[in-house]
């Protein structure tokens, strides 16, 4: 556990982690302070951050399970202590840490007698099981248990739909909420018109994110929500400027990215995510599938590397360069 003394800043707005601990593999706790804030600002930020922490962060979980010769969800299987429903509920609790986008497959294939735990899940390399000791089922006889799983990244809580699954697959209520709980409190200090506030923010996570990672992710998501308002004003200004400006010749892709890298020197490129650059949905999804999430990831690839991405075209490469040149005001 890490604790630090709280020193209140009287000038520049600063945030700090004052307590951090891991109570178990699936329970992390962090306490943060932000100060100094003007009267009323702490509550504004605290409410927004709590909602973003609980509702805007994506998590990874099992959303479907399939096993042969299972007549219905509430049936039992000879040689297995738990019913099918109980196994599904145990699978629902498995916590994953991943950066995958979309849906991936996983599986369990074991032979009894033995206990089945999360360690027995065969998952893609991009998916890590947070607690491999999580219990799934108990095989009491020498039988085979094979389950196909569907793993998905999403956010919030999604209730399974009551459809008819004749292929032997069963949906699982998706709980894609890495943050278990979040609270904020406010401490006021000073007198009269000089009154200021300190915001205390407490975060509990399930281990798929640390509290600090969750705080950063929630902050980024909040920023993304407000970007359209900023871009609307920028677009109006650009339209006026472009009426009297000649179109400049395009850089080559290599020179353009080199120039961008120089302009961004001194800024943490790994903190600039590509979803902040207003890329077209298809281009954005192609980059995400290739594990290109930040500007640093993008600048680490050459034009040839990008052209190797499935469904990627030379027009996409030119479009990316144009958007980044505009974003970072390259002359």
Swiss-Prot record:
Enzyme class, first EC level, given as a word: transferase
Catalytic activity: RNA(n) + a ribonucleoside 5'-triphosphate = RNA(n+1) + diphosphate
One Gene Ontology term from the biological process aspect of the record: DNA-templated transcription
Protein location: Plastid, Chloroplast
Molecular functions (GO terms): DNA binding; DNA-directed RNA polymerase activity; protein dimerization activity
Region spans: Alpha N-terminal domain (alpha-NTD): 1-233
Disulphide bridges: none
Protein name: DNA-directed RNA polymerase subunit alpha
Protein species of origin: Illicium oligandrum (Star anise)
